[in-house]
Regions:
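SAM-dependent transferase fold signal centered on methyltransferase-like domains
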Residues: 1-153
Length: 153
């Protein structure tokens, strides 16, 4: 893996688990989420992330890995999981309001949604303005659409 501000990182199949475990329930989402570098995912080496973190993929084929382990993985970005909830516009809007969130970064995998339409429904912009900024990941966990509120770690 090549990056503009780092030395090359080598990831290969010897680092990967042969079978990638998946999360079995919403309650099994750990406190850490890892987003692999796109090159790792495209090379089919997600098992290297699950092996390095002792984690599980949120749902088959989505690429996000959750774990109980707080480890530095040079080929994945780590997030602290603040909140896990079933996806619903009303419940997410209520959570954002309760926490004073006025700016939102939306990441998604495995969920078909229009970001701009969701922002209109949530009544929230991209920039924080007078409130706080948050990052939400819309994805599936064990087949269920969920929202993971995360902080870069």
């Amino acid at each position: 893996i090549l990056g503009p501000d780092r030395s090359p990182i080598e990831v290969d199949e010897t680092m990967a688990e042969p079978e990638i475990p998946t999360v079995e329930s919403l309650g099994a989402v750990g406190p850490w989420l890892y987003e692999p570098d796109r090159a790792v995912t495209q090379a089919g080496l997600l098992g290297a992330v699950t092996a390095a973190t002792l984690g599980s993929e949120v749902d088959t084929g989505l690429g996000y890995v959750v774990s109980e382990a707080h480890v530095d993985v040079p080929f994945a970005r780590r997030y602290a999981v603040r909140e896990v909830m079933p996806f619903g516009v009303k419940s997410l809007r209520a959570w954002l309001k309760q926490h004073g969130i006025t700016g939102l970064t939306i990441k998604k995998r495995g969920v078909r949604l229009d970001d701009d339409e969701l922002r209109r429904q949530l009544r929230i912009g991209r920039k924080a303005g007078d409130g706080a900024q948050a990052t939400v990941i819309l994805t599936r966990v064990a087949g269920q659409q969920v929202v993971l509120v995360v902080d870069p770690a």
